[in-house]
């Protein structure tokens, strides 16, 4: 190696106590935050996706498949009217 960039070696980083003190707090915190974001239903509201019990309503029980190649717009309009 001709020069040094001044960065610490990866082995030095992962064997340091400071690294594990910081990451033993942040990694579980991120996991808990993500789990609560999904389990409370906030993820459905933020991203606008339907909740698991909203995929199939009483009036619409079939799977919305587009089967025709040339009449796909009509099938899509038909499907969107059922909302």
From Swiss-Prot:
Q: What is its main location?
A: plastid
Task: State the needed cofactors, names only.
Answer: heme b
Please provide the record's keywords in A-Z order: Chloroplast, Electron transport, Heme, Iron, Membrane, Metal-binding, Photosynthesis, Photosystem II, Plastid, Thylakoid, Transmembrane, Transmembrane helix, Transport
The record's cofactor note says:
With its partner (PsbF) binds heme. PSII binds additional chlorophylls, carotenoids and specific lipids.
Q: Its domain of life?
A: Eukaryota
Checking PROSITE patterns in the record gives: CYTOCHROME_B559
Question: Which GO terms of the cellular component aspect does the record hold?
Answer: chloroplast thylakoid membrane; photosystem II reaction center
UniProt binding sites for heme: 23
Subcellular location(s): the record lists: Plastid, Chloroplast thylakoid membrane
| MF (Gene Ontology) | electron transfer activity; heme binding; iron ion binding
Task: Please tell me whether the keyword Thylakoid is annotated for this protein.
Answer: yes
* InterPro entries for this protein: PSII_cyt_b559_asu, PSII_cyt_b559_asu_sf, PSII_cyt_b559_CS, PSII_cyt_b559_N, PSII_cytb559_asu_lum
What processes in GO biological process is this protein linked to?
photosynthetic electron transport chain
Entry's transmembrane regions: 21-35
Please give the Pfam families that the UniProt record associates with this protein.
Cytochrom_B559, Cytochrom_B559a
Membrane topology per the record?
Single-pass membrane protein
Q: Quick one: signal sequence residues?
A: none
Work out whether the entry's keyword set contains Plastid. Answer: yes
Family as reported in the entry's similarity comment: Belongs to the PsbE/PsbF family.
PANTHER family xrefs: CYTOCHROME B559 SUBUNIT BETA-RELATED
Query: Per its database record, what is this protein's job?
Result: This b-type cytochrome is tightly associated with the reaction center of photosystem II (PSII). PSII is a light-driven water:plastoquinone oxidoreductase that uses light energy to abstract electrons from H(2)O, generating O(2) and a proton gradient subsequently used for ATP formation. It consists of a core antenna complex that captures photons, and an electron transfer chain that converts photonic excitation into a charge separation.
Q: How does it assemble?
A: Heterodimer of an alpha subunit and a beta subunit. PSII is composed of 1 copy each of membrane proteins PsbA, PsbB, PsbC, PsbD, PsbE, PsbF, PsbH, PsbI, PsbJ, PsbK, PsbL, PsbM, PsbT, PsbX, PsbY, PsbZ, Psb30/Ycf12, at least 3 peripheral proteins of the oxygen-evolving complex and a large number of cofactors. It forms dimeric complexes.
In Swiss-Prot or TrEMBL terms, this protein is called: Cytochrome b559 subunit alpha
Origin organism is Nymphaea alba (White water-lily)
Q: Lineage, please?
A: Eukaryota, Viridiplantae, Streptophyta, Embryophyta, Tracheophyta
């Amino acid at each position: 190696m001709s020069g040094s960039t001044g960065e610490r070696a990866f082995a030095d980083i992962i064997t340091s106590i400071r690294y594990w003190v910081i990451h033993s707090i942040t990694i579980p915190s991120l996991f808990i935050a993500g789990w609560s974001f999904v389990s409370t239903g906030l993820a459905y509201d933020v991203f606008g996706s339907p909740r698991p019990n909203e995929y199939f309503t009483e009036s619409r029980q079939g799977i919305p498949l587009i089967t025709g190649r040339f009449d796909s717009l009509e099938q899509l309009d038909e499907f969107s009217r059922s909302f």
